[in-house]
């Protein structure tokens, strides 16, 4: 499996204020419903269509105020993957966040989409940090 790690971003809040949102897919509904097709979510699962692929995700592990592990849950995504949302509280008003992706990619897929996956992780974590810092 290939590992992709986002840049670390700073959120000016304690981890206890961030964790409830990143550990519950239903809280993402307002932000994502108009960006993907057929968005459906419960606390621990979600599914949607993105660029012709049906994506299903399931939260498989939660460690309060530390991390959330998400894995693929059915769908038509042509790879096995897992990703983590990691939180590290440095002080009461300073939590660092990063995303880690493990994906099973053959050599050709790695060459075709590896840089896009890395860029996507970096953009996603920047967006998460910006959103939490605006609240």
PLM region spans:
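Glycine-rich portal/gate segments that line the openings of hydrophobic small-molecule binding cavities
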Residues: 30, 35-78, 135
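Generic structural detector for well-ordered beta-strands
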Residues: 8-12, 58, 86
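Short secondary-structure boundary/capping segments
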Residues: 1, 38, 59-60, 87-89
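Intrinsic-disorder/low-complexity, polar/charged segments enriched in Ser/Thr/Lys/Arg/Asp/Glu/Gln
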Residues: 2-8, 45, 54, 67, ...
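Hydrophobic ligand-binding cavity/cleft-lining segments
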Residues: 1-40, 45
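Hydrophobic pocket/interface hotspot
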Residues: 18-22, 28, 46, 59, ...
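Beta-strand/loop substructures that line and gate deep hydrophobic ligand-binding cavities in soluble
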Residues: 75-123, 130, 134
């Amino acid at each position: 499996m290939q590992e992709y790690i986002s840049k670390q971003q700073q959120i000016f809040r304690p981890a206890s204020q961030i964790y409830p949102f990143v550990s519950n897919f239903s809280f993402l509904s307002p932000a994502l419903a108009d960006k993907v097709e057929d968005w459906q979510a419960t606390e621990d699962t979600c599914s949607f269509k993105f660029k012709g692929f049906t994506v299903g995700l399931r939260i498989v592990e939660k460690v309060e105020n530390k991390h959330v592990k998400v894995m693929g849950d059915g769908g038509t995504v042509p790879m096995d993957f897992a990703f983590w949302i990691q939180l590290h509280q440095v002080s009461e008003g300073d939590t660092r966040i990063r995303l880690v992706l493990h994906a099973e990619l053959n050599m050709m897929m790695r060459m075709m989409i590896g840089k896009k996956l890395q860029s996507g992780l970096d953009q996603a974590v920047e967006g998460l940090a910006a959103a939490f810092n605006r609240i």
